[in-house]
Swiss-Prot record:
The protein, known as: Nucleoprotein
InterPro entries documented for this protein: Flu_NP
GO aspect biological process, one term: symbiont entry into host cell
Annotated segments matching region Disordered: 1-21
Keywords, in A-Z order: Capsid protein, Helical capsid protein, Host nucleus, Host-virus interaction, Ribonucleoprotein, RNA-binding, Viral nucleoprotein, Viral penetration into host nucleus, Virion, Virus entry into host cell
Motif Bipartite nuclear localization signal, residue range(s) on this chain: 198-216
Locus of motif Unconventional nuclear localization signal: 1-18
Length: 498
């Protein structure tokens, strides 16, 4: 990409960004991981969790949610001002699972937010350590991306459920900052913009007055983030049009949906990071590993090595398959919900199946679920190979894809051709090429028509043996192209509900 030099790497986004060299970045990311680990150890002590209970991913999720809630300034302010019955705005908590007399019991805990903030800051050398919080948000977002298909949300904004490969990060909170913006897919950005424009259409004052000015600058900022994800001049020019509109309305929504569709073939650049649950970092820190000293990267071998040596457990419902639960979490750990399943199977060393074939529901257990028959089992999060995460959409390419998901958004920088169902995508581009953006539309359609099946993305890039820490011997995988490549194939994944 031409503008590569002006962009900050996502490690720089993670680290509030002065230009740092690789060693400083690795130390800085390591420091963030140390903080999360120390916090988790302290919380396990507070909650009197055994080692096994502390490694239970459901307990990890509760603890992560508690600290995120304790630092959610806007929501905390809102709760103070709009008290609701039975909810203490100063407290946060959730279900903690303990092993009592040979069975799993659920216990609801409640803590002062102030106390949680104190423990968090203490674990992070007195800092608010926003980066660590964002890191946990991205882990939750990646888990949601792997667990749920956002069909309803897509349909509500006038998009097509088959565009789900563009929806990475769709459940990230708005406060997730630059690191959060980096991992949002094209569809996620488009959806946020469409919601904004719709509010403007329905509420005359949305763009007006003091607040309207803030709204407008947020709108333009989001347009610029989206523009920065596109890799072709025509798509970017289209975003300039949308951004400069005097009074954003249906024409802009049309343009946005058009550009989202085009991203199925002319893919945008979306960052991928392996963000692991706190219960992975905690035990590593308590075993004496010093992440800051050793250095850590979210996009290299480090998360793979960490998972090779970690024991994580999960509660399993009576009719769930533990191997399937493991796949779900493994994909979430590597931000791989929209990657080609053939490549994932190769890296993981065991077959990775589409969501609809997995006998597993989400990782979190609802408060009304019966605990009587809950078992627990070890999550298998190890891999056969490792590969470098990508921030590029790769070139585009077509091939038989599936009824559900009709494109992929690559996670790993590994040579392959990227599947998409060209005829299906192109069918959506008949008709409307008039209006202000007609020349851009024509240009975009021309480029999509020209996308070639034999074109290879990430040429020469391969996966690496886990012993090859310096990435010296790339192994270029060969795939059985007759297999299904899409995760949300013909989908019967549950919907994500807030």
């Amino acid at each position: 990409m031409a503008s590569q030099g002006t962009k900050r790497s996502y490690e720089q986004m993670e680290t509030d960004g002065e230009r740092q060299n690789a060693t400083e970045i690795r130390a800085s990311v390591g420091k963030m991981i140390d903080g999360i680990g120390r916090f988790y150890i302290q919380m396990c002590t507070e909650l009197k969790l055994s080692d096994y209970e502390g490694r239970l991913i459901q307990n990890s999720l509760t603890v992560e949610r508690m600290v995120l809630s304790a630092f959610d300034e806007r929501r905390n302010r809102y709760l103070e001002e709009h008290p609701s019955a039975g909810k203490d705005p100063k407290k946060t908590g959730g279900p903690i699972y303990k092993r009592v007399g040979g069975r799993w019991m659920r216990e609801l805990v409640l803590y002062d937010k102030e106390e949680i903030r104190r423990i968090w800051r203490q674990a992070n050398n007195g800092d608010d350590a926003t980066r660590g919080l964002t890191h946990m948000m991205i882990w939750h977002s990646n888990l949601n991306d792997t667990t749920y298909q956002r069909t309803r949300a897509l349909v509500r904004t006038g998009m097509d459920p088959r565009m789900c490969s563009l929806m990475q990060g769709s459940t990230l909170p708005r406060r997730s900052g630059a690191a959060g913006a980096a991992v949002k897919g094209i569809g996620t950005m488009v959806m946020e913009l469409i919601r904004m424009i719709k509010r403007g259409i329905n509420d005359r004052n949305f763009w007006r007055g003091e607040n309207g000015r803030k709204t407008r600058s947020a709108y333009e900022r989001m347009c610029n983030i989206l523009k920065g994800k596109f890799q072709t001049a025509a798509q970017r020019a289209m975003m300039d049009q949308v951004r400069e509109s005097r009074n954003p309305g249906n024409a802009e929504i049309e343009d946005l949906i058009f550009s989202a569709r085009s991203a199925l073939i002319l893919r945008g650049s979306v960052a991928h990071k392996s963000c692991l649950p706190a219960c992975v970092y905690g035990p590593a820190v308590s075993s004496g590993y010093d992440f800051e000293k050793e250095g850590y990267s979210l996009v290299g071998i480090d998360p793979f090595k960490l998972l090779q040596n970690s024991q994580v457990y999960s509660l399993i419902r009576p009719n769930e398959n533990p191997a399937h639960k493991s796949q779900l979490v493994w994909m979430a750990c590597h931000s791989a919900a929209f990657e080609d399943l053939r490549l994932l199977s190769f890296i993981r060393g065991t077959k990775v199946s589409p969501r609809g074939k997995l006998s597993t529901r989400g990782v979190q257990i609802a408060s009304n679920e019966n605990m009587d028959n809950m078992e627990s089992s070890t999550l298998e999060l190890r891999s056969r190979y490792w590969a470098i995460r990508t921030r590029s959409g790769g070139n585009t390419n077509q091939q038989r894809a599936s009824a559900g998901q009709i494109s992929v958004q690559p996670t790993f920088s590994v040579q392959r051709n990227l599947p998409f169902e060209k005829s299906t995508v192109m069918a959506a581009f008949t008709g409307n090429t008039e209006g202000r953006t007609s020349d851009m539309r024509a240009e975009i359609i021309r480029m999509m028509e020209g996308a070639k099946p034999e074109e290879v993305s990430f040429r020469g890039r391969g996966v690496f043996e886990l012993s090859d820490e310096k990435a010296t011997n790339p192994i270029v995988p060969s795939f059985d192209m007759s297999n299904e490549g899409s995760y949300f194939f013909g989908d019967n994944a549950e919907e994500y509900d807030n």
